UniProtKB/Swiss-Prot annotation:
This is Caspase A. Belongs to the peptidase C14A family. PANTHER family: CASPASE 14, APOPTOSIS-RELATED CYSTEINE PEPTIDASE, MUCOSA ASSOCIATED LYMPHOID TISSUE LYMPHOMA TRANSLOCATION PROTEIN 1/PARACASPASE. PROSITE patterns: CASPASE_HIS, CASPASE_P10, CASPASE_P20. It is an enzyme of class 3 (hydrolase). Cysteine protease which, in vitro, cleaves itself and caspase ced-3 into their mature active forms. Also cleaves, in vitro, inactive caspase csp-2 isoform b. Required maternally to induce apoptosis in a subset of cells fated to die during embryogenesis, mostly independently of the ced-9, ced-4 and ced-3 canonical apoptosis pathway. Involved in the degeneration of dopaminergic CEP neurons in response to high Mn(2+) levels. The active site is at H364, C406. Keywords: Apoptosis, Hydrolase, Protease, Thiol protease, Zymogen. InterPro entries: Caspase-like_dom_sf (IPR029030), Caspase-related_regulators (IPR052039), Caspase_his_AS (IPR016129), Pept_C14_caspase (IPR011600), Pept_C14_p10 (IPR002138), Pept_C14_p20 (IPR001309), Pept_C14A (IPR015917), SPK_dom (IPR006570). Heterodimer formed by the tight association of the large subunit p16 and the small subunit p14. Isoform a: Expression is restricted to the late germline pachytene stage of meiosis I in both L4 larvae and adult hermaphrodite gonads. Isoform b: Expression is restricted to the late germline pachytene stage of meiosis I in both L4 larvae and adult hermaphrodite gonads. One of its GO terms (biological process) is positive regulation of neuron apoptotic process. It comes from Caenorhabditis elegans.
């Protein structure tokens, strides 16, 4: 019997209230009286938390449900519904808000089995809006309640229901969208060769909102360029002073002002005419601020122990000219140590009040996803993107992190490259500093969705990135060329994909019979199209 199992195994931790609750539930439920819970199953429950709940009637943040214990889930749901009903009767008499541990904790159960997840969602989803509305939770608790159990809500319906009766800011709503069933919260796609595949990055399964307007077109899949190198890992790099090009002698120009005639008119990439497209469409980011956005360029040339990055100044010039032309404010900071780079990024995020932001990281890099300060200390690119994604000033705004650096130790000894053969274990002080920064804007523990962020790399993971000492890097030079040609007719993903095509097909190092190539890569979490012409 259930009661006997509890009494035999947990006498020291449970009081008469728990036994009475189990007894009442078993009597009123449709479950057979012969149902038992084995000692092994019952031990999966965190007894202390369950005891506290039953004794005080106050829900804690600790999980109390065991894996695959459907009976215990039903029992807990029954208690919770009764608890909520009793509490809501006291709303008018109670002046202060309910404790954040009340009700919220049930939504944050760390349940592993699909059965448990579906049961929780089925029981709680209809209850969630009323619980939030009635109990007047603060915004942070509201977000955690929805995120904790992986419950998807219709964000539009949520906004309409609660703006009139509950205090909720736009910032809070924008974070809720990240965890809602809104179809704009795309998990992204993966490109393997020329085949596109959906990938799932959120902590719960991607879900499309039901009963959507059939006339609304789904956003097109995000392109992820992943071109494999044709060279084997044992291939010796040639000795070559400067990169050469397959065609177009005019490519030797070192500025980013390119004419129509100089551009490859036979490009096979699809064009998206920004003038003809509907910029009021929900799948285009707003670009109406003046200035249109802010660009921060962190450019490191002189390092403590690594090779000097000759040519990075030309990248700075090309990028500054380009984005000033696109009506962006450009800030360039040179030769920073790793901690100073993080401080600069923090200041950049806090001062950004435009419709979009762009961060360029021009430095040496490694295969661990980091770029280096001039003190040879690493800054993790993914942590930077996470910081920007969750910053209050940047919610719902498109954010682009562009990295021009090596991503591995496959070095070309004859061509200057942005890389480091090996990374020593020097990152602890920087990680500590970074965690402190993150804790100030990300209370609690969340799995990052990196919504509205796109990261572009100059090369594929594991390979080097090439740089001309006079003209700058292949990647930045090609990117500026494509932007000057197509910034009014392409959105950002098309521009970056065309940039990748140019680098792959038009640049190479040749020494005898050996050909070295470079393939840029894109990782996108954008939820809309990013155009660089003003919204109409």
């Amino acid at each position: 019997m259930v009661l006997k199992t509890i009494e035999d195994n947990c006498k020291s931790q449970f009081d008469d209230d728990l036994v009475e609750d189990f007894n009442n539930f078993q009597t009123t439920s449709s479950m057979s009286s012969s149902t038992t819970i084995s000692t092994e199953d019952f031990n999966t429950i965190e007894i202390e938390s369950t005891f506290e709940i039953c004794r005080s009637g106050s829900y804690t943040e600790e999980p109390i449900l065991g894996e695959n214990d459907e009976f215990l889930i039903d029992f807990e749901m029954e208690r919770f519904l009764k608890f909520l009903k009793d509490k809501t009767k006291q709303v008018e008499k109670r002046k202060e808000p309910f404790s954040q541990k009340e009700i919220y904790a049930v939504f944050q159960r760390r349940i592993k089995s699909e059965l448990c997840i579906e049961t929780v969602k089925k029981k709680f989803q209809p209850l969630l809006p009323n619980a939030i509305q009635t109990c007047e939770f603060d915004e942070e608790t509201m977000i955690r309640m929805i995120y904790g159990a992986g419950i998807r809500i219709d964000s539009v319906d949520f906004w309409n229901r609660f703006t009139s009766k509950a205090t909720i800011s736009l910032d809070c709503y924008s974070r809720l969208i990240s965890y809602s069933s809104d179809s704009l919260t795309l998990s992204g796609t993966h490109r393997s060769g020329f085949t596109y595949h959906w990938i799932s990055t959120p902590p719960v399964t991607y879900h499309r909102t039901e009963n959507k307007d059939p006339n609304i077109q789904e956003p097109s899949p995000v392109e992820f360029l992943d071109v494999q190198s044709s060279l084997g890992s044992s291939m010796k790099p040639p000795i070559l002073d400067k990169p050469t090009k397959l065609d177009d002698p005019a490519e030797t120009r070192h500025d980013c002002s390119y004419s129509l005639e100089e551009y490859d008119s036979q490009s096979r990439m699809p064009r998206t005419d920004a003038k003809k497209s509907n910029h009021k469409h929900k799948y285009c980011y707003e670009m109406n601020s003046n200035p249109r956005g802010t660009v921060l360029i962190l450019s490191n040339e002189n390092f403590k122990n690594m090779e000097r990055r000759v040519g990075t100044k030309q990248d700075e010039v090309n990028l500054t000219k380009l984005f000033q032309k696109l009506q962006y404010t450009v800030i360039c900071k040179r030769n920073l140590e790793a901690e100073s780079m993080l401080e600069a990024i923090k200041e950049f995020a806090e001062m950004a009040h435009t419709d979009s932001i762009i961060l360029f990281l021009l430095s040496h890099g490694d295969g661990a996803g980091s770029v280096f300060g001039i003190d040879d200390m690493p800054v993790n690119v993914m942590e930077v993107s996470t910081y920007l994604a969750y910053h209050q000033n940047l919610l719902l705004k498109p954010k682009w992190v562009a990295v021009s650096a090596c991503r591995g130790g496959k070095l070309n000894m004859g061509v200057p490259v942005d890389g480091l053969p090996a990374l020593e274990d020097k990152c602890a002080p920087i990680s500590k500093f970074w965690n402190l920064m993150m804790s100030r804007i990300m209370p609690g523990t969340f799995t990052s969705l990196n919504a509205d962020v796109i990261i572009s790399f100059s090369t594929t993971d594991g390979f080097t990135s090439y740089r001309d000492e006079e003209a700058g890097t292949w990647y930045i030079k090609s990117m500026c060329k494509v932007f000057n040609k197509h910034s009014k007719t392409m959105h950002l993903l098309d521009i970056l994909t065309e940039t990748g095509r140019n680098v792959v097909t038009k640049y190479e190092n040749v020494q005898g019979n050996v050909v070295l190539k470079q393939a840029p890569e894109i990782l996108s979490r954008l939820t809309k199209q990013w155009h660089f012409s003003r919204s109409m």
